[in-house]
Amino acid sequence: MLLLAIDTATSAIAVALHDGEHVLAESSTLDARRHGEYVAPGIVEVLARAGRTAADVSAVVAGTGPGPFTGLRVGLVTARTFAFARGIPVFGACSLDALAHQTWLQDAVELGQSFVVATDARRKEVYWARYDVTAGGVVRKGAPMVAKAEAIAEEVRGLPVIGRGAVLYAESFGARVGPLDVSAGALADLAARMLAAGQQLPDAEPMYLRRPDATPPPARKSALP
């Protein structure tokens, strides 16, 4: 298996190749406003570094967010287009879960510990979820949510916080540990483990949690009688 992973749910435009056991190559560019400019070059880069071609890729996994509308859409559309052109399956995986899995891979949290993943949702809000650490990995407790950082400060008090939200809203959260943005290598590793265990991955559908910031203008009333 050669798995192409793409995530654009955070400030990182992240791409990786995974052979089912190891990350072969990974690319990450930080730019919260220019996802569309970097994701395709990232794919070219990881294929070249791994000595592979697009024809070698057997499946694609895309981070489904939650994340800001425009950036998240770039990664998902790219993943679907690549998979369609190659006639291969495309899967989705929650980007918060990928960040949590990345934290576990880095041994940044301990067995039995609970922690929070919080990424930037703009408008002084975060996308967040709570996780427990088990011997086999991390387990999310409930669905991802979006909220003002200050509104969940009491609920998460005392818990380590992973993700860029911990930096942007440090006054609302506890100690920051682990990574800030999603690693496509961790996303690929999470997906590969789930597939190997016979678990069904979700479709590559975006998890927005709220309406986009940009909305179409209201229709003008006709001046004609």
Question: Language model features by range: what are they?
Answer:
Residues 22, 34, 89-183, 198-201, ...:
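Surface "functional belts" at beta-alpha junctions
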Residues 61-95:
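DPxDG-like acidic metal-binding loop motif
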Residues 1-66:
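N-terminal beta-alpha supersecondary unit
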Residues 48, 52, 193-200, 214:
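Generic secondary-structure signature for well-ordered alpha-helical cores
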Residues 182-195:
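Short, flexible loop segments at boundaries between secondary-structure elements
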Residues 44-51, 100-105, 153, 192:
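Generic structural signal for well-ordered alpha-helical scaffold segments
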Residues 9-12, 124, 202-203:
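Short, basic and Ser/Thr-rich N-terminal targeting/leader segments
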